Amino acid sequence: MSVPTVLERIIARKFQEVAERSARVSLAELERLAKTADAPRGFANALIEQAKRKQPAVIAEIKKASPSKGVIREHFVPAEIAVSYEKGGATCLSVLTDVDYFQGADEYLQQARAAVSLPVIRKDFMVDPYQIVEARALGADCVLLIVSALDDVKMAELAATAKDVGLDVLVEVHDGDELERALKTLDTPLVGVNNRNLHTFEVSLETTLDLLPRIPRDRLAITESGILNRADVELMAINEVYSFLVGEAFMRAEQPGLELQRLFFPEQVKKTVQPLD
């Protein structure tokens, strides 16, 4: 019997989590909370408008830990990090809410979003419509759908639920087959290419460059993972990729927002980003 991959273990846990959460808070109650949540801030539109100007459209990630790296940031105050990112020029935020594998929390999303005016994506492993409604109830503006974790029917169902509650969708792919499935099944303009293989956690920027010619021009290609220095950013710009999701490079820096500036807006680096206490 083969050993389950990290992704397979995470997905199995998510089904358990949905059962546990829905026993505590009903879907009907979540739907009520979703209707009273703050209006969505336009996650997709913010990225598209920035990328149209050929300026870096950065989704800056708030992430305490990961399965492959363990704890990434010891001093972890989501609201402070969010403010630092906003000052540093982020277009959107990504907040990990997975508890078991990334040491995330729903409260982190709420704290980060309350501290800034930026749109926020709930970064988690979506397997059930319950989680989508829950994301809107928490105040999220967008959800992530990972193609390798979903079949086409479930992917379409989750996207339809997102649309119903007013959430944008970022669909994430890692290879050509997943890209083909995503383009066929969903009409979201946001196509994220994860340079990290979620089964092995190996990273290669070639993943984005290989898939880029197959992403239609009316979709926005977002490169995710493995952007560590200016050379990586410039490589993407040469290939007309202006949208990025970056987490670890920022989380390891003393001042995440200043690191964002250094990486994406070096000409603007000044003493404007306050140190985190």
Swiss-Prot record:
This protein's UniProt keywords: Amino-acid biosynthesis, Aromatic amino acid biosynthesis, Decarboxylase, Lyase, Tryptophan biosynthesis
Q: Name one GO biological process term.
A: L-tryptophan biosynthetic process
Q: Name one Pfam family in it.
A: IGPS
Signal peptide annotation: none
Q: Does the keyword ATP-binding apply?
A: no
List, alphabetically, the CDD domains matched. IGPS
Q: In which pathway does it act?
A: Amino-acid biosynthesis; L-tryptophan biosynthesis; L-tryptophan from chorismate: step 4/5
For this chain, the annotated S-S bridges are none
Q: Which reaction does it catalyse?
A: 1-(2-carboxyphenylamino)-1-deoxy-D-ribulose 5-phosphate + H(+) = (1S,2R)-1-C-(indol-3-yl)glycerol 3-phosphate + CO2 + H2O
Q: Does the keyword Amino-acid biosynthesis apply?
A: yes
Q: Which GO terms describe its molecular function?
A: indole-3-glycerol-phosphate synthase activity; phosphoribosylanthranilate isomerase activity
Which superkingdom, per the lineage? Bacteria
* Name this protein carries in UniProt: Indole-3-glycerol phosphate synthase
Q: Species name for this entry? A: Pseudomonas putida (Arthrobacter siderocapsulatus)
